[in-house]
């Protein structure tokens, strides 16, 4: 990748120009190059670059891109410390101090490096941190498949893998990207093992609460399979999740009556919980029954007779349930409902359906052969 340079001169002259520029901005730095070589010059230049990050003139962008371009031409073994130092400077700049420039500089550095260099991890983490402070997460790559590939390419340790995923999750949350954040959190929790699951206790707790809060999250059984979530078994938060996964509204109401303070401490809205549990309960009813009377719905979902039809219309809008209202007979005719859990029983049902299709297709094929032979 070609990175913009400060001036088209030799690396040594470029370093000298940068020194002079920084000194003119008030930095405590010598105008003379170091005898130790370019990497020593860059270390001193990066240490003094704070002064120009506060300015708003065009020379700032040129000078900082020049620093980036010089870092990129160094041998890999000399880059790492400089990259860490530069990233630290760009991240620590106060909020509001040219975040778009800092993002651009980090992006130039990130994309200018060889794709397999582990030091890209440091730059990517810095990108996430800066993007989070200015709501600029949309300007950096966050696709989970790509992040997985980078984690593999950089051969990250388990700890560093957790760091980058946690940073990405928090940045997505801060930038109101709840759907993407939820996927990243599941990826993070899924990377823990039985040996270290206890370390993710707080992350698992956050994941459950955010899933319960999300008005569009209805299928939560996959969370129970995550090892850090399993580690919470026996705690109220795990009991609450289990209710949202497979229990009825009545179970939630009983839980709330016994643990109101706990629900409030999580920042959950009881009214929103009731609304979600009504839909989840209705989904379960629709799986087991092709026809459901208004009276049954009213009783199971604890609502007034005048609320039933509006509820059904809202339920259909979620696309979790497909049904029609029979106003004459005061009932609902179900055509399809999404299973709240997908376990062994559901796999067996799917197998039976596919096997039936296979047998029917074979019958059709044999019939066509018989006709053609005749």
From Swiss-Prot:
Residue span(s) of domain PCI: 180-339
Pfam families: eIF3m_C_helix (PF18005), PCI (PF01399)
Domain of life: Eukaryota
SMART domains reported in the protein's UniProt record: PINT
InterPro entries in the cross-refs: ARM-type_fold, COPS7/eIF3m, eIF3m, eIF3m_C_helix, PCI_dom, WH_DNA-bd_sf
GO cellular component: eukaryotic 43S preinitiation complex; eukaryotic 48S preinitiation complex; eukaryotic translation initiation factor 3 complex; eukaryotic translation initiation factor 3 complex, eIF3m
Summary of subunit composition and partner proteins: Component of the eukaryotic translation initiation factor 3 (eIF-3) complex, which is composed of 13 subunits: eif3a, eif3b, eif3c, eif3d, eif3e, eif3f, eif3g, eif3h, eif3i, eif3j, eif3k, eif3l and eif3m.
Family named by the database record: Belongs to the eIF-3 subunit M family.
Name of this chain's protein: Eukaryotic translation initiation factor 3 subunit M
């Amino acid at each position: 990748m070609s990175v913009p340079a400060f001036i088209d001169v030799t690396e040594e002259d470029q370093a000298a120009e940068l020194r002079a520029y920084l000194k003119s901005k008030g930095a405590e730095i010598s105008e003379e190059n170091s005898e130790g070589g370019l990497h020593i010059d860059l270390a001193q230049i990066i240490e003094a670059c704070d002064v120009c990050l506060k300015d708003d003139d065009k020379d700032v962008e040129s000078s900082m891109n020049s620093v980036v371009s010089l870092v990129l031409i160094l041998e890999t073994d000399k880059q790492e410390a400089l990259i860490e130092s530069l990233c630290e400077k760009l991240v620590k700049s106060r909020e509001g101090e040219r975040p778009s420039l800092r993002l651009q500089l980090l992006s130039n550095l990130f994309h200018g490096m060889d794709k397999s260099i582990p030091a890209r991890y440091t730059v990517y983490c810095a990108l996430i941190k800066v993007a989070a402070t200015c709501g600029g997460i949309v300007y950096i790559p966050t696709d989970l498949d790509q992040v997985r590939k980078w984690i593999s390419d950089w051969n990250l340790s388990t700890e560093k893998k957790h760091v980058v995923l946690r940073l990405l999750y928090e940045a997505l949350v801060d930038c109101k990207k709840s759907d993407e954040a939820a996927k990243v959190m599941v990826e993070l929790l899924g990377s823990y093992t039985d040996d270290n699951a206890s370390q993710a206790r707080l992350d698992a707790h956050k994941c459950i609460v955010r899933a319960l809060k999300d008005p569009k999250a209805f299928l939560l059984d996959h969370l129970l399979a995550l090892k850090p979530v399993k580690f919470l078994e026996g705690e109220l938060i795990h009991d609450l999740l289990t209710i949202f996964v497979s229990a009825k509204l009545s179970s939630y109401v009983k839980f709330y009556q016994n643990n109101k303070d706990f629900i409030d401490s999580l920042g959950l809205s009881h009214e929103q919980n009731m609304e979600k549990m009504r839909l989840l309960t209705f989904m379960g009813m629709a799986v087991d029954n092709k026809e459901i009377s208004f009276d049954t719905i009213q009783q199971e979902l604890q609502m007034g007779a005048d609320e039933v039809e509006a509820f059904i219309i809202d339920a259909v809008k979620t696309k979790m349930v497909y049904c029609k209202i029979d106003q004459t007979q005061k009932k609902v005719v179900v055509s399809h409902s999404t299973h709240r859990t997908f376990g062994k029983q559901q796999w067996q049902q799917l197998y039976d359906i596919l096997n039936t299709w296979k047998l029917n297709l074979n019958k059709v094929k044999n019939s066509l052969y018989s006709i053609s032979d005749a």
